Amino acid sequence: MTPSLQDAKITFLGGGNMAAAIIGGLLAKNINKQNIYVSEPWEVNRNKMADLGVRTTTDNKEAAADADVVILAVKPQVAKGVCEELSSAWSSRSSLPVVISIAAGITLASIAQWFKGDSGKAPPIVRVMPNTPALVGEGASGLYAAQDVTDAEKELTSALLGSVSKATEWVDK
């Protein structure tokens, strides 16, 4: 069952500017800080996230182990490795989290293939294109979902992105 935004365990893989903006929006909506986990390799960014009161680590597998939502907020050149790393870590999970990619220029098909790995199973994936006004809570986001994303997962994604966007729009291509 898909949890509500208030109850969801949300993991950010990457702690850059857009992740920080979304986290700020979530905290402004009184989301429990302990439900937000950020995996970030750079100490400076990790410390900024810790200053917000959320949990931090350098270990993607640890951060995403029991997540309901994983936000792929990494640089495009490292996305494949991150997805493949999690694919092996999630092989024993009975249900997979919804993955929301804000990584620029990476297709759903690529993300799905990277997650499938040896298991042949990809999580439900949503691709989001937030714009820079999201950095100050005034954004607009275009969202595109893979076919296996449920209505409840779409609602959760809309609520999450609504924390930094004045408008969210689902598109079909």
Q: Model-predicted segments: where are they?
A:
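Rossmann-like NAD(P)(H) cofactor-binding subdomain of soluble oxidoreductases
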Residues: 52, 60-65, 69-72, 76-143
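Residue-level detector of anion-binding/catalytic polar loops
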Residues: 55, 69, 167
